[in-house]
Amino acid sequence: MSSSKPRIALTMGDPCGVGPDVIAQALASPTLFECCTPIVVGDPSALQRSMALSGASKKVLVLREPAELPDDPGSDRIPLIAPVELSGRDIEHGRPTAATCGAVVRYIESAVAFALAGQVRGVCTGPINKARMHEHGFDFPGHTEFLQALTGSRRVVMMLAGPRLRVSLATIHEALADVPALLNVEMLREVIRITAEALIRDFGLQAPRLAVAGLNPHAGEEGRFGREEIEILRPAIESLRPPGRCTVTGPYPADTLFQRAHAGEFDAVVAMYHDQGLVPIKLVHFYDAVNVSLGLPIVRTSVDHGTAYDLAGTGRAHPGSLTAAVQLAALMAHNRFAAVSPVVP
């Protein structure tokens, strides 16, 4: 890849959902082509149908692999790789089938393989419906865990990132009642380390400020409302001092921490569980938050919304999250492949 713009594999997600629609809308303008060369991994007929719906005049350029693409293919064509063929009757808005769910898996597997082989610099994944996928044999809680298995990664951290707020999660898709037992010093150290490394290497921050949220109300109030802050969170944070390039502080009461981070006091927050971290970021970045997988050997971002079957084919799906996800993948790829691996806590 000699082009200065990184190639980003863009998986379609569920072709029966809004994935094709938001891709068609996002790629109808030249904006994304200015920061990267997007390569859609998905179904050509689904994309063409969505392009017609959006009024896009671009043509789909079907490839077998990224290596077939010229260094500068221009912005008048949308490169696409179709790892599996689907019939027209398989792709009905809002009605996923065993065939389409199987195709979704192939899209992800192919994009990851291209990234591991160096044929693309990053992967941006479209929305999938985990419940429908599970009905048809998908045995992972979600994208993040599947990517962890495909890349053989020991630990992957889920981050939601917006222009004013970034949040990593210590635990992801877990019942709230199970969260306290899942937290331990070594696990939290690793989550903090992976987040700190990504802030430097992928986000390009020279001296990031990372804050850790408490688990309990008022961060436990010195043990009155729980001892996790005393026995787990503080030891994990203290073990990372003296700090390296990243300053790590906390644990802070979560009810005020996110406002402080949003105001610019911190560059990112480590939250203890799913809704603690995702409620505030979706409140302020509902249309432009990006799901980022940290700790992988590849760059991976994703839209921060689902398949929205009720909007598929209506032209009302909003492409903002997809546009932001591709732009962030391009930025992360540029930073990662231009930089030397950082030394972090």
Curated annotation (Swiss-Prot):
Catalytic activity, reaction form: 4-(phosphooxy)-L-threonine + NAD(+) = 3-amino-2-oxopropyl phosphate + CO2 + NADH
Annotated positions binding a divalent metal cation: 173, 218, 274
Entry keyword set: Cobalt, Cytoplasm, Magnesium, Metal-binding, NAD, NADP, Oxidoreductase, Pyridoxine biosynthesis, Zinc
The organism's place on the tree of life at top rank: Bacteria
InterPro entries membership: PdxA, PdxA_fam
Binding positions (substrate): 143-144, 282, 291, 300
Cofactor binding, per record: Binds 1 divalent metal cation per subunit. Can use ions such as Zn(2+), Mg(2+) or Co(2+).
Class of enzymatic activity (EC top level): oxidoreductase
EC number: 1.1.1.262
Subcellular location: Cytoplasm
Annotated metabolic or biological route of this protein: Cofactor biosynthesis; pyridoxine 5'-phosphate biosynthesis; pyridoxine 5'-phosphate from D-erythrose 4-phosphate: step 4/5
Disulfide-bonded cysteines: none
GO process annotations (BP): pyridoxal phosphate biosynthetic process; pyridoxine biosynthetic process
Location (main, coarse): cytoplasm
GO cellular component: cytoplasm
Known cofactor(s): Zn(2+); Mg(2+); Co(2+)
Note: The active site is located at the dimer interface.
Job of this protein: Catalyzes the NAD(P)-dependent oxidation of 4-(phosphooxy)-L-threonine (HTP) into 2-amino-3-oxo-4-(phosphooxy)butyric acid which spontaneously decarboxylates to form 3-amino-2-oxopropyl phosphate (AHAP).
Quaternary state and interactors: Homodimer.
Similarity comment: Belongs to the PdxA family.
Name the record gives this protein: 4-hydroxythreonine-4-phosphate dehydrogenase
Organism: Syntrophobacter fumaroxidans (strain DSM 10017 / MPOB)
Gene: pdxA
